[in-house]
């Protein structure tokens, strides 16, 4: 089984691309979805113990947690020390299931793939990319997003140009959905030797 690592800076279209891989029959694991599950599950008491006042009714309040760690590298390291091992456990379970299912290709969607060294655990890296103006427009349209938040997030992420230079495949997400589906189908066909499953 070939494991693809999908990554890219915020607002570049990772979620859309991951959904299209899934449509094409590729099992997909999302680190972000795992974090959401963990924040309302087993990570919540650990985060409350590390950052008191950030959990309400057993669920992490992401806004309060963001305020507790923004601009504080040591606090971010503490948070990652709690969350990353749990996310890795979920990823390992996904890989075992995908292998068992007989999948030729599986995809792990990890926003901080390079930043956390996770590229060493995948066979090929797929980076989603779009021009900076499109990225900023997409991100600032999100509820609760501000220039300050975007700046803080981008400071933690390796620049887009470097990600592209380290990728095996680059998906240009600035065009139409059909164009993105075509790019994804080409990757799947090239790696598996079989046409991608019909995508709508």
UniProtKB/Swiss-Prot annotation:
It is an enzyme of class 2 (transferase). Keywords: ATP-binding, Coenzyme A biosynthesis, Cytoplasm, Kinase, Nucleotide-binding, Transferase. GO terms for molecular function: ATP binding; dephospho-CoA kinase activity. Pathway: Cofactor biosynthesis; coenzyme A biosynthesis; CoA from (R)-pantothenate: step 5/5. It comes from Brucella abortus (strain 2308). The gene is coaE. It is found in: Cytoplasm. Its EC number is 2.7.1.24. Belongs to the CoaE family. One of its GO terms (cellular component) is cytoplasm. It catalyses: 3'-dephospho-CoA + ATP = ADP + CoA + H(+). One of its GO terms (biological process) is coenzyme A biosynthetic process. CDD domains: DPCK. This is Dephospho-CoA kinase.
């Amino acid at each position: 089984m070939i494991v693809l690592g999908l990554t890219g800076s915020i607002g570049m279209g990772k979620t859309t691309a991951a959904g299209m891989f899934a449509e094409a029959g590729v099992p997909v694991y999302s680190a972000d979805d795992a974090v959401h599950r963990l924040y309302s599950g087993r990570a919540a008491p650990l985060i409350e113990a590390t950052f008191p006042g950030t959990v309400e009714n057993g669920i992490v309040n992401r806004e309060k947690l963001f305020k507790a760690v923004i601009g504080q590298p040591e606090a971010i390291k503490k948070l990652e020390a709690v969350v990353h091992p749990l996310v890795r456990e979920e990823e390992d379970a996904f890989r075992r299931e995908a292998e068992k299912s007989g999948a030729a290709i599986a995809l792990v969607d990890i926003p901080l793939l390079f930043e956390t060294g996770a590229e060493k655990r995948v066979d090929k890296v797929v980076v989603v990319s779009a021009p900076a103006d499109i990225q900023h427009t997409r991100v600032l349209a999100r509820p609760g997003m501000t220039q300050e938040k975007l700046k803080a997030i981008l400071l933690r992420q390796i620049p887009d140009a470097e990600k592209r230079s380290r990728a095996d495949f680059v998906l240009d997400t600035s065009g139409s959905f059909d164009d993105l589906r075509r790019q994804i189908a080409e990757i799947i066909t090239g790696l598996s030797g079989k046409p991608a499953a019909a995508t709508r």
